A protein has these predicted regions:
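A conserved mid-to-late transmembrane alpha helix and its immediate loop/hinge
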Residues: 10, 15, 21, 80, ...
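A membrane-periplasm/extracellular boundary helix in multi-pass inner-membrane enzymes
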Residues: 16, 32-72, 80-88, 96
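Long extracytoplasmic/lumenal interhelical loops at the membrane interface
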Residues: 62, 66-80, 84-125
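Structural signal for the C-terminal ends of transmembrane alpha-helices
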Residues: 30-38, 55-58, 141-149, 191-199
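Hydrophobic transmembrane alpha-helices of multi-pass, membrane-embedded glycosylation machinery
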Residues: 6-7, 22-34, 46-51, 138-140, ...
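Hydrophobic transmembrane alpha-helices and their immediate junctions
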Residues: 29, 43, 127-168
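Transmembrane alpha-helices of multi-pass inner-membrane enzymes
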Residues: 159-212
């Protein structure tokens, strides 16, 4: 089943012609293998990625590679427009989906969002909201690290960490996490951190058991 699901996902990625999604997939797979300590598999995957990247540069497997320059130029235009909006509303931002209000005002490229998770967050919620989100995420990451230390649901923790890495990597060129489907999927996986979430008391009980 897992192999079938992976193949379906790979076919979907190829049909979408999304280079950033493919890059995110390969990088998160590398991160997963490294965390699991599978260095040989990680090395093999790295070599496979290098071969695929070389093949993609020919434009035969991935025709969209020929339009990379135009796509990157469009991204630069979108990011520049977002930065102008951030500069004018730095403190509290302009609310959700703010880019749709910004691009007409600054004659920017017309699209739905800033195509960058970090810029879009600042544009929507400003420095105040961005800092609040940052510190909340930091707190959750600390909890996740503690769960690793006391070996609480390790496989689930790895899944959460890899998905978080995918959000950050793909967030460099898109804001897919804000979509309903992907956002709900991430939250569903993230709820696994609620299993035995009192890490300190769990660690203390484990310590007491080792003493006795």
């Amino acid at each position: 089943w897992y192999i079938g699901i992976i193949l379906v996902n790979l076919i979907g990625l190829y049909m979408s012609m999304s280079m950033s999604s493919c890059m995110t997939l390969f990088l998160t797979m590398l991160i997963y293998l490294m965390i699991k300590g599978k260095k040989k598999s990680a090395t093999a995957l790295f070599l496979f990625i290098a071969i695929i990247a070389f093949a993609l540069l020919s434009g035969q497997i991935f025709p969209r590679i020929d339009t990379t320059t135009d796509i990157f130029r469009t991204r630069i235009d979108v990011w520049s427009t977002a930065l102008k909006g951030i500069a004018d509303h730095a403190l509290f931002g302009m609310g959700p989906s703010a880019y749709q209000l910004v691009w007409p005002a600054y004659s920017g490229y017309p699209t739905f969002h800033a195509h960058n998770l970090f810029l879009d967050t600042l544009l929507n919620f400003g420095v105040v909201g961005g800092c609040a989100i940052f510190f909340y995420v930091l707190t959750q990451l600390k909890l996740l690290m503690k769960r690793f230390q006391v070996n609480v649901c390790k496989n689930r923790n790895i899944l959460v960490l890899v998905m978080f890495a995918a959000v950050l990597i793909h967030g460099c060129t898109d804001v897919t996490i804000f979509w309903i489907q992907t956002g709900m999927l991430f939250l569903l996986v993230y709820t696994s951190t609620g299993i035995q979430n009192n890490v300190k008391s769990f660690a203390q009980r484990k310590h007491n058991m080792s003493i006795h």
